[in-house]
Amino acid sequence: MPKMKTKSSVKKRFKITATGKVMCGPGNKRHGLINRPQKMKRTNRGPQTMTDMDAKTIKQWAPYGLS
């Protein structure tokens, strides 16, 4: 049986921690920031943890994990 391939978009956008959580960068940071509240801009700075259902899908698309 051939090897399964990891989706290229998943490699670029997500990281899997040692405990198995999936981390992603938040959206809504490209333009229109002058209209957004300061709290939203502040919380969008760092990486965020994905929900369990979304993380399950991402892990299926990355069968060998992400380094």
Curated annotation (Swiss-Prot):
Residues 21-50 are annotated as: Disordered. It holds the Pfam family Ribosomal_L35p. Keywords: Ribonucleoprotein, Ribosomal protein. SUPFAM superfamilies: L35p-like. This is Large ribosomal subunit protein bL35. It comes from Gluconobacter oxydans (strain 621H). GO terms for biological process: translation. One of its GO terms (cellular component) is ribosome. The gene is rpmI. HAMAP family: Ribosomal_bL35.
